[in-house]
Amino acid sequence: MPKPEPRPLRTLPERAFHARARLVAALMCCVCFAGLAARLAYLQLFAGGWYTNRALGQQLRDTVVPADRGRIYSDDGVLLAANSSCWTLRASPREMPEEKLSLAAQGLAEILELDEAKLLEKFSDRTSNDCLLRYRVERDTADRVRDFCEENGITGIRINQDSKRGYPEGEFLASVLGFTNVDNAGVSGLELKYNDVLTGQNGVVLTAVNAWGYTLEQSYETEKVPLEGSGLRLTVDANIQHYLENALDYAVKEHHVAARAVGIVMDVNTGAVLAMSTTPAYDPNQPRVIYDAAARKAVDALTGSERAAALQLAQQTQWRNKAVSDLYEPGSVFKLITCAAALDAGAVSKNSTFYCGESISVAGTRFHCANHKRHGSQTVTQALENSCNQSFIQIGARLGKEAFCDYFAAFGLREPTGVDLPAEPKKSLYYTADRMGPVELASCAFGQSSKISYMEMAAAVCAVVNGGRLMQPYLVSDILNPDGSILQHTEPVCRRQVIKPETSETMREMMEAVVLYGGGRNARIQGYRVGGKSGTSQKLDSADEKARIASFVAVAPIDDPQFLCLVCLDEPHSWTTAGGSLSAPVCAEVLEQTLVYKGVPRAVEPETDPDPAQTAADLPADGDSFDGA
């Protein structure tokens, strides 16, 4: 047998080449192995959670169970806002029997008042596993759908429990409560201001599904129970609120008020708001329906984009709480502030005398009293009774612009009141001392040329009569746990001392004189001592030169102040625009009912003989007017 030929020896370069090849191969294997190891480590250590969640997402379907918002109660326990159960209907077309799609569309369209053709089109999309049928239906509708599906063997229809906000009292306190949107989030009023407090924690139901998205047996479900939000107990008393709303409703209709009316009732010693109304109101259960007949008629007369814009404006107008959000010229009611400031600063006493002739000239501008009335020589008390512009121009001049502006700020008229409602203006419109000349000081002294909020005016008058303390207005007395126990209580807050207690006492005497002898006689209440002040202010920024705001503020009992009522009728069209004639009777009606309801006993009335300087046939014509710029 022949011997095999010997293998030729490799040369040195060949051996080096093969060695390098083996080394490269080994390195490549190491790199690949390291890459796989790194990928595995990444998946195990870092991406595991993501893949787990993705797998669960394919295996589980989560359904949110909305939590109820907290309830809102009046101070006397009337339920004002609460959630009620409802049901949202959805369908999974891929789970519905194909041979029953037409039957399902026909039956559900009839029950839910939907278009049958559109419903059948939805059901025919076999790739869909979720489509909305009807949002938030009542129990009887949900029961009819359930019975129909069970009787006809129709699967794939889901009836999910839901929750919706409701207001059992309808229009009652609407501008204060506000309303919520379709997601149960606050849009306005207390619902918006306390949205985080009222909002609960949603629950969830996890349902297992198979690879095709079909729901498995209910034994695979797990549930996280929703938690109800915290509730609110208001300072508002439902009875006093009814007194105010009823009186305002009548006044608005009787005097043809064009730009809505405002009413506020407060506890003068704590700042608690006992009632607040902007009239006409709206129903927060249907907030997008225009309830003012004139506004609705104006909107309906338009078409297209003009109608849409007008509708939006009308809705925003009716939602706005005028008592808090609007600024206005306070008119002669503001004379209480000028008078209190001048007395407190020592610029005048209640017996200081001033002369009122046909008119008074200030830096070339002539001012006169309403109807060009001449009051002659009178004390400060009589000037307040007569609502005399000329006298208050002189009082303002004695006080001086620096002191006037200081007291204006001290009474809280240059800053928000801090009331717990949204949309309060950040500042009012006013003159600072460096921009105030003699004419501006003159007009500001009797209540024109400045614009403040109704809430600011009410809080300031509370300070005038309660001993001089400026209290922060508030509407929520308690935040409640879902079981009704108190989670947080609101204590009254005194912002500062504005005037001396003795000044406040003098002002109470003078305000009572206004009701007994002056332009506030229509605010008198048998058996109760009342103090007040009227106002009839020009709307200087209105295109209508005759536009007026008729207002009156009253406090009772004036010898032991407890309740304040401010009523303002914006643009009344009646036999007069005088606040002492139109608004004072509203205040009297509301306060009398409130005093009786609160158990304040009637007392023997003091003598009410006419003031020596005033006779019944010579009542002051309340109003504010001037000539010139």
Go through each PLM region and give its residues:
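Beta-lactam-recognizing serine transpeptidase/beta-lactamase-like catalytic domain environment
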Residues: P2-R7, A81, N210-T222, N269-V333, ...
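Periplasmic/cell-envelope proteins involved in peptidoglycan metabolism and beta-lactam response
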Residues: M1-L302, Q318, L327, E402-G412, ...
